[in-house]
């Protein structure tokens, strides 16, 4: 139903409700304090107790049929089931930690029941980033490979980039020139041998040493110049094409990274950083190898084979050309078939490599959790299991490589022997000279080097295509949150926020909101409260367009947020999240991240308002102090103050505080909230507070109580207390715990939780 909200003056009706610290935090029950134990910790406790009953410690990490596939996925699933505001279940179905994953898992686009109506759910088992989710036929794989090459050609031969095209043409010209010079080398050998070997029938007087020196010396000089010229052309080609290759890699990597940043929050919550970054790294290296192999190996080798076959057919007869052609065909067939057989071993090795990478990164990022539960041996065992799989796959790769090399050598040696026999027979019959035999030998041996490289190149080319397929598939992941083309910017006049009949759920079978409607008045402080899992944090995620509702509309100052540009929408909204994201940089940079063009004076002003200057005074390096990976070198309260400073520096029109002071002591919290309120009063900004500790929001102009997918009640603190509804129950529970009524309060909280669970049960 629609909820009408009247405009309220910017003042509390009761001074006692404006006092921060009215109730001591140690008197609040743990169930009301959400940060007393995090969702991850609860999941870890459950997982820890379950895991102690298992006889196989690799059950979750290494069993393909495992329900969760990795401890991180288990934590995410448990957190989502408990809170209702985390990872969509349909997007957490496959992560690279499971044994069935080969590279990294993509988030399937959400189903209609849990995402935008425009989205379609990916069929199970057809994950675009899991290359082994369904075995492709040879024809399908060829189509995929050609599609990758065509896509790459767009970067090598870009429209409108005349300079890059010039470099490509010049590189090809140098390639042809180098091969023409390279083919001349055996002819100079033939000339040298024939002139020195046939003194009697030579057209010149070869009995004269000076003549011999001139003829032989000229041939040797030509031989040397041909080799030097071929090498010079090759190196020039490398230098010219290097710019093309590196620029293509840069463009592809930038395109993939841009697409990753455009993906929705749900997709990123189901990723494991180690596997994702490893896949991108291998993909960019694959581009480099593919370009160099095509330009420097495959095309040159094909050109050289064609020229050699033509020369042998013209100079020595069709039998030599036929042997050469048959050899090349047999060599290529054997290499391709064997390499295709070996590809699955490389995929298995890559999968194990990814599992090892994700396991190590996951363990190191969650170092404290590992220590808290004494699970070092468990993490080491998981890592060792992945390394053991990699070891087995690598052994298969090495042994199959030996078989491939042996077969290639047998084919080439047989061909060389046959051609030498034919040449020797020609010399005996007088149809060929000794120089012709040397020329044939040199021509065939000259093919041996590129052929040997061709085998290696094809093997690596196949692997590069696999890696590039993984990386390019990242770009094929659907962007769940899209903006209209030429969408106008959001124009904020006051900051009124209105939800109209919004329905949304992270899980298809568990909606968080059911046709919820409410209005947040412009320029006032509004608070959202309610039991855990009622969707308080979800309001911000929908407002920020991290997710799209299944139905309903959201407006800011009368403008549908789906019709305005994402950049302007997110520029006008600022948030202090529960878990503060910090970069591994100094304090100044982390504050300035709120507005990158801010001056040092602006940064320090925001720091003072957020009480960060109190931290800086005690640090030897001041604002240049590094905060460490994810800010782990500073306390939780200090991280929250940095987040508040960053928000104040951004100076958005709408401010969202999600348990923004839960890690602060009462004194610091009081001072910080006083500064925040002063800012809100001065600028008349719309502020939304989410809190479990009701004393921190009791002075709000308006309080909205959520339960069961909708608005349970709303009003000022006094109005809600007078009505003695859910808000009154929560307030009484927090006020009485620790003063002799703990048992009764706990029973009351259990009743509230039962009501919440029953109200969110799918209907």
Swiss-Prot record:
Residues 1-44 form a transit peptide. This is Iron-sulfur clusters transporter ATM1, mitochondrial. It is found in: Mitochondrion inner membrane. Belongs to the ABC transporter superfamily. ABCB family. Heavy Metal importer (TC 3.A.1.210) subfamily. Keywords: ATP-binding, Membrane, Mitochondrion, Mitochondrion inner membrane, Nucleotide-binding, Transit peptide, Translocase, Transmembrane, Transmembrane helix, Transport. It is a multi-pass membrane protein. Residues 107-118 have a biased composition (Low complexity). ATP binds at residues 506, 530-541. One of its GO terms (cellular component) is mitochondrial inner membrane. The lineage of its organism: Eukaryota, Fungi, Dikarya, Basidiomycota, Ustilaginomycotina. SMART domains: AAA (SM00382). Its EC number is 7.-.-.-. One of its GO terms (molecular function) is ATP binding. Residues 45-167, 242-290, 337-402, 459-763 are mitochondrial matrix. GO terms for biological process: intracellular iron ion homeostasis; transmembrane transport. Residues 168-463 form the ABC transmembrane type-1 domain. Residues 497-733 form the ABC transporter domain. Pfam families: ABC_membrane, ABC_tran. Homodimer. The keyword Phosphoprotein does not apply. Residues 190-217, 315, 422-436 are mitochondrial intermembrane. Glutathione binds at residues 342-346, 405-408, 455. The keyword Nucleotide-binding applies. It is an enzyme of class 7 (translocase). Performs an essential function in the generation of cytoplasmic iron-sulfur proteins by mediating the ATP-dependent export of Fe/S cluster precursors synthesized by NFS1 and other mitochondrial proteins. Hydrolyzes ATP. Binds glutathione and may function by transporting a glutathione-conjugated iron-sulfur compound.
